Curated annotation (Swiss-Prot):
Coiled coil: none annotated. GO terms for molecular function: GTP binding; GTPase activity. Its main location: membrane. GTP binds at residues 16-23, 64-68, 122-125. This is Probable Ras-related protein Rab-4A. The keyword Flavoprotein does not apply.
Amino acid sequence: MESDRFDYLFKFLIIGNAGTGKTCILRRYTERKFFPNTQHTIGAEFGSRVISVDGTHVKIQIWDTAGQERFRSMARSYYHDAVGTLLVYDITNRTSFGAVEQWLGDARHLATPGVVVILVGNKKDLRDTDGQVTHWEANTFAQENGLQFIETSALTGENIDDAFTSCVRVLLSKVKSGELGADRLLVGSNKQHLQAVNLTASATSVSASQSSAATAHSDTCLC
């Protein structure tokens, strides 16, 4: 569902090495399309979507951060007030899986305490031909670190919605139990309440269809 009315506003991050398909995941989720010529992100890309989970309307504001090491310090500035994180690796690239522990450390150190992190193995459509990271080893890492785990394909759309929805469901449970303060997350449909959420300053001024930074050209989805 798409609507201006929502009960909660959650800030999400998509993090992981460059080339894992983070921007493709963002655009598949927010625009319902796959863009094969997606470019490397410099700084961050932004998108949003309103969904209904168990009768509660939630607006997700999603920041897709640059994965290149030279932009790592810049990307860290986007962690403030994030409550949900998709930690993405490419199942056809073992190096990207080897980096998830460092990315996880950043999320847990810099984002909101208790941030919900889901480990996402992207490019599932290539597993049979080019897979380098098994489902078992990724799932083992997730269990050892208290993460949810899912494999996705931005190309086909498989499990993209489920990744975000499962995170939102856990967050709503945390709000209900008092583990996450609703005073920071409760927004409502009245525009005057938007100031109650402490997002990165530029977040409220960027539309869902805009990028917050320039990008460099590429021939494939190297986002």
